[in-house]
Amino acid sequence: MSDEEHTFENADAGASATYPMQCSALRKNGFVVIKGRPCKIVDMSTSKTGKHGHAKVHLVTLDIFTGKKLEDLSPSTHNLEVPFVKRSEYQLLDIDDGYLSLMTMDGETKDDVKAPEGELGDSMQAAFDEGKDLMVTIISAMGEEAAISFKEAPRSD
């Protein structure tokens, strides 16, 4: 018998959190990874090919989790990583200790998403305190998740 210990931290199938895409194929409102962060492209421009070199693509992006502005300048022929971004809606069950308690469509509970801060968090807490049924939109990319919006759930009378 071997004395080695095997630890498996997470149970994904080894799928990548990103895929490569050529700079020239990126589009405004699309997603891209800049400095290791998943970002949404808010503005992009291309410069002409210079005397020595390639056309450049200038990207202005916002981090999808922090809202921080990040910029990048790359040759149009280079590949950049694009994150797989997933949006899911969950029913809000409770807000406790800064975390959301959510229910998936198949009845499972999910308690590992942080409650949003700032105006979104305050208005979500206020609507929840009023007893409204809320649906929360969660965005997930590259192993991170965050609540980005909420709406009142439709009444099923």
From Swiss-Prot:
UniProt xrefs under InterPro entries: IF5A-like, IF5A-like_N, NA-bd_OB-fold, Rib_uL2_dom2, Trans_elong_IF5A_hypusine_site, Transl_elong_IF5A_C, Translation_prot_SH3-like_sf
Record keywords, A-Z: Acetylation, Cytoplasm, Elongation factor, Hypusine, Isopeptide bond, Phosphoprotein, Protein biosynthesis, RNA-binding, Ubl conjugation
Residues with the Hypusine modification: K51
GO cellular component, one term: cytosolic ribosome
Name the record gives this protein: Eukaryotic translation initiation factor 5A-2
Expression triggers: Expressed in anaerobic conditions. Down-regulated by heme and the ROX1 and REO1 transcription factors in aerobic conditions.
Note: There are two genes for eIF-5A in yeast.
Main location: cytoplasm
Matches recorded under PANTHER family: TRANSLATION INITIATION FACTOR 5A FAMILY MEMBER
Modification sites for Phosphoserine: S2, S74
Function recorded in the entry: Translation factor that promotes translation elongation and termination, particularly upon ribosome stalling at specific amino acid sequence contexts. Binds between the exit (E) and peptidyl (P) site of the ribosome and promotes rescue of stalled ribosome: specifically required for efficient translation of polyproline-containing peptides as well as other motifs that stall the ribosome. Acts as ribosome quality control (RQC) cofactor by joining the RQC complex to facilitate peptidyl transfer during CAT tailing step.
Annotated positions of the N-acetylserine modification: S2
Segments crossing the lipid bilayer: none
PTM-bearing positions, type Phosphothreonine: T7
Glycyl lysine isopeptide (Lys-Gly) (interchain with G-Cter in ubiquitin) crosslink site(s): K86
PTM note: Lys-51 undergoes hypusination, a unique post-translational modification that consists in the addition of a butylamino group from spermidine to lysine side chain, leading to the formation of the unusual amino acid hypusine. eIF-5As are the only known proteins to undergo this modification, which is essential for their function.
Complex and partners: Homodimer. Binds to 80S ribosomes. Actively translating ribosomes show mutually exclusive binding of eIF5a (HYP2 or ANB1) and EFT1/eEF2. Interacts with DYS1 and LIA1.
Pfam family name, one: eIF-5a
